Amino acid sequence: MIKNIGVDQIEVDRIAKVVDRGDGFARKVLTDREFAQYQDLTHKRKIEYLGGRFAIKEAFSKAWGTGIGQAVSFEDVETLRTESGAPVTTSRIFTGRIFSSIAHDDHEIVAVVVLEEPAGWRRAIGKLLHLLSGRKK
C-alpha cells in the first residue's frame, strides 16, 4: 500500500553555481557512497547527479511529511546508480519500498519518490496498539 508521494524540482543553474564553488555542498548533501560516485563524473554530470540526489532527498522528506530537518536528514536517504544508470533509493529511517525517478533537461531537475509501506505494516501496528492498550478481545 502506498504511504505517500513526494515531488521536488530544482533549477539546473542553482546547482551549477554550487558545483562551481567546490565540493562543500556536495559533501553536505551526499552520503559517502553517493560522493564516491559523484567524484568520478564530468562537470555536466556532477550538476545532474548532485541536483538529482538533492531533489530525491527533498522529495523523500515531503513524502515523509516533514521536509529536511530534524526528522529527515540528507544522510537518511541514499540514491545510487545501477550499472544501467537507474537510481536505486534506500533509507535508514524507512523500511518499506522506495520508488524513485529523476528527470532533467537543460533548465530543470525533477524527482519523484513513492513510499510503499512494508507488507503487513498496518496489521502489525494494529496488533501492537491492541496489546499496549491492555484491552481484551
Curated annotation (Swiss-Prot):
Organism from which the protein derives: Lactobacillus delbrueckii subsp. bulgaricus (strain ATCC 11842 / DSM 20081 / BCRC 10696 / JCM 1002 / NBRC 13953 / NCIMB 11778 / NCTC 12712 / WDCM 00102 / Lb 14)
- The gene for this chain is acpS
Q: Which cofactors does this gene product need? A: Mg(2+)
Class in the EC hierarchy, top level: transferase
| Gene Ontology CC annotation, any one | cytoplasm
A GO BP entry: fatty acid biosynthetic process
Q: What does this protein do?
A: Transfers the 4'-phosphopantetheine moiety from coenzyme A to a Ser of acyl-carrier-protein.
Protein's UniProt name:
Holo-[acyl-carrier-protein] synthase
Q: Which family does it belong to?
A: Belongs to the P-Pant transferase superfamily. AcpS family.
Which InterPro entries does the record cross-reference, listed alphabetically? 4-PPantetheinyl_Trfase_dom (IPR008278), 4-PPantetheinyl_Trfase_dom_sf (IPR037143), ACPS (IPR002582), Ppantetheine-prot_Trfase_dom (IPR004568)
Query: Where is the protein situated, by its record's location annotation?
Result: Cytoplasm
- Protein EC: 2.7.8.7
Question: Which keywords belong to this entry?
Answer: Cytoplasm, Fatty acid biosynthesis, Fatty acid metabolism, Lipid biosynthesis, Lipid metabolism, Magnesium, Metal-binding, Transferase
- Give the domain of life: Bacteria
Residues binding Mg(2+): 8, 58
Q: Name one GO molecular function term.
A: magnesium ion binding
Instruction: Tell me yes or no: is Membrane among this UniProt entry's keywords.
Output: no
Task: From the UniProt record, list the reaction(s) this protein catalyses.
Answer: apo-[ACP] + CoA = holo-[ACP] + adenosine 3',5'-bisphosphate + H(+)
Q: Which Gene3D superfamilies match?
A: 4'-phosphopantetheinyl transferase domain
Q: Tell me the Pfam families matching this sequence.
A: ACPS
